[in-house]
Amino acid sequence: YTISGCLLNEALQSKEEFTPEMQKEIDDWFDQQPDFLPQTDSLSQRTNVVVILCESLESWVLERKVEGKELTPHINQLLKDSTTLYAPHVLTQVKGGRSIDCQLLLNAGMLPIANGCYAVLYPNNNFYTLTKAVTEGNERNATLLTVDKEVTWNQGMVAKAFGIGTIFSKDSWVLDEKVGSRKKLGDVSFMKQSVEKIKKNVVRMSPNNNYLQFVTYSGHNPFKLPEALQQIHFKGDYPERMRDYMTMAHYTDKAIGIIVDYLKSRPDYENTLVVIT
């Protein structure tokens, strides 16, 4: 249980030999699965992609009312849209890299390694990513917006490997809403400032082949939102952690509403695919 012991154990575990038997087990599993084909009749071609990675946002708060109040009214409204594809029955597949593993899953379509973190061990890999496909190799058209430092989970190097040319990180924002134990920028202010940067063309959003990726923070454990930022309250005797999570989810939902409403106001919205996960 020492630091050196943990590192040694991780190194030993990560060098497990991949055997022909393991390959056969994988192949047999795929052979037993039904083919899933794209629903081409319900999908129209979009050349702009906006991805919103929400920290610890779980599906149980969606489409749910507590004491007559919607926990996520803005997302709920999106779910009613006939063009929305909703996949609620998805289990977490991240490993030791947590949120940075999510970026690997979504952007590169790859599962994270079982031990350790790919972002630290393999940041210089040549990844075939959604970003590169959307921007057709033009990194100027791909932007990452995060309230973290670039060194957090080695985000800076990973973004470059994924084909993201521009990063707006911690020092790019005015810290006017402090949220969480680490007092980072709250989601609502993050989205408000992001919209202003897009309007002023500080954040580049070209009409075509554009990729924007937002990474939120406020939903990070322990889900403590300052009272001044709380816009939903409950009278019932709920477990403290549950109450805190519902309050935080409502706050993050408001932030999502801000950026989505802005995107809808743009003339290129019909050409934009918005992914919230």
Each language-model region and where it sits:
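Transmembrane and membrane-interface helices of multi-pass
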Residues: 1-13, 77
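Fold-level signal for large, globular catalytic cores of enzyme and receptor domains
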Residues: 19-20
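Solvent-exposed soluble domains appended to multi-pass membrane proteins
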Residues: 24-277
